[in-house]
Amino acid sequence: MSLGPLKFQAVGEKGEEDEEESLDSLKALTAKLQLQTRRPSYLEWTARVQSRAWYRAQARPEPVGPGAICGFDSMDSALEWLRRELQEMRAQDRQLAGQLLRLRARLHRLKVDQVCHLHQELLDEAELEMELESGTGLPLAPPLRHLGLTRMNISARRFTLC
């Protein structure tokens, strides 16, 4: 009775099966959510390359330019296309980074506003309770200092985006 070849792995090392499983689950999730995993320009390029009749070109030898590569007329045109794509990607990256920073600043502002609002509500409730307990109906001069509650002094200089 033979056991077959044994495979040993270091602790924490992923096997090929785990990687294939995670890749398969990622592909399934992408298909389920109907996400596009390729840039439109890449899809255009593949369509451009696949639209050429490679078999017909091989069957009938036409004088093809000496620099024709992968659907481009020359290496220079391929490099120019690549440069344009990289510039577009850079511009998109800058746009997304700016949008992310604006969202982060807005989120931070909303959090500070919420904390200020909650603190003000806490002070108002506690002050009302103290007025009802004392029965005088007059607001207290130092609001609830003996309970450890003070008004918050929130200034924009105390908070940063980092």
Curated annotation (Swiss-Prot):
InterPro entries: FAM167, FAM167_domain. The gene is Fam167b. It holds the Pfam family FAM167. This is Protein FAM167B. The lineage of its organism: Eukaryota, Metazoa, Chordata, Craniata, Vertebrata. Belongs to the FAM167 (SEC) family.
